[in-house]
Swiss-Prot record:
It holds the Pfam family EFP_N. GO terms for cellular component: cytoplasm. It comes from Streptococcus uberis (strain ATCC BAA-854 / 0140J). This is Elongation factor P. One of its GO terms (molecular function) is translation elongation factor activity. CDD domains: S1_EF-P_repeat_1 (cd04470), S1_EF-P_repeat_2 (cd05794). InterPro entries: Elong-fact-P_C (IPR015365), NA-bd_OB-fold (IPR012340), Rib_uL2_dom2 (IPR014722), Transl_elong_fac_P/YeiP (IPR020599), Transl_elong_KOW-like (IPR013185), Transl_elong_P/YeiP_cen (IPR001059), Transl_elong_P/YeiP_CS (IPR013852), Transl_elongation_fac_P (IPR011768). Keywords: Cytoplasm, Elongation factor, Protein biosynthesis. Its main location: cytoplasm.
Length: 185
């Protein structure tokens, strides 16, 4: 059992027969009354997200999640296909369950598949990935690193803010936890 006050982003727990992943969690102490935990959660099985509050002392059954190394194969319609790199088993995951993760991976990228028992529930991507800029505004002569930056569209469709000197065709290192530019590759 885990208390609501100990839940953090990325953790998974069971509540009312549902498997829930924490997207955001924060403590709030109103002027009057008791502390509450505000959370943005996702039902792992349906993909629906919702906001809720809990008392910090509420307890939940923490879900035991196992991971296996895998490779992203391709996406077709509403399904993403992955292959276990040890057993060569293939897994189909609804795109709605891995929508954010697909912004950071290309076909044949290495990932980790998350299992709850024998059920595939999600994908973990590396902390940083290298992606190519497909579209951005032209560089401005004399632009410096301290500028405010400009938006750049990457090969997966992800849009990140980059320094002014970045041009289309360059490979960038992207932080997957925050969705931000780190450096040129």
């Amino acid at each position: 059992m885990i208390e609501a006050s100990k839940l953090r982003a990325g953790m998974t727990f069971e509540s009312e027969g549902k498997l829930i992943r924490v997207l955001e969690a924060s403590h709030h102490k109103p002027g009057k009354g008791n502390t509450i935990m505000r959370m943005k959660l996702r039902d792992v099985r349906t993909g629906s997200t919702f906001d809720t509050t809990y008392r910090p002392d509420e307890k939940f059954e923490q879900a035991i999640i196992e991971t296996v190394p895998a490779q992203y194969l391709y996406k077709m319609d509403d399904t993403a296909y992955f292959m276990n790199t040890e057993t060569y088993d293939q897994y189909e995951i609804p795109v709605v369950n891995v929508e954010q993760e697909l912004l950071y991976i290309l076909e044949n990228s290495d990932v980790k598949i998350q299992f709850y028992g024998s059920e595939v529930i999600g994908v973990t991507v590396p902390t940083t990935v290298e992606l190519t800029v497909t579209e951005t505004q032209p560089s401005i002569k004399g632009a410096t690193v301290t500028g405010s930056g400009k938006p750049a569209t990457l090969e997966t469709g992800l849009v990140v803010n980059v320094p002014d000197f970045i041009e289309a065709g360059q490979k960038l290192v992207i932080n997957t936890a925050e969705g931000t530019y780190v450096s040129r590759a």
